[in-house]
Amino acid sequence: IVGYTLVDAATGRVVGEIESVDDSTMNLLFQVRTADGDEVLVPAHEELIRNIDTEERRMELELPEGLLDL
């Protein structure tokens, strides 16, 4: 999963690259680096995952509304 491109399933927009998985909290989080160099923490819940393409190293996630606006 680390190194995969994270894509917003609703819009098709590339969020960024998954740099690590944070398991220090009750819920897993993907640490994602955006094209602008910002860091975004995204919930890594299986119900949010829409598709994983291992050949393209892409993961589509149904992101919670407004998450990227924070």
Name every feature range the model reports, one short phrase each.
Residues I1-L70:
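Peripheral interaction segments used for macromolecular assembly
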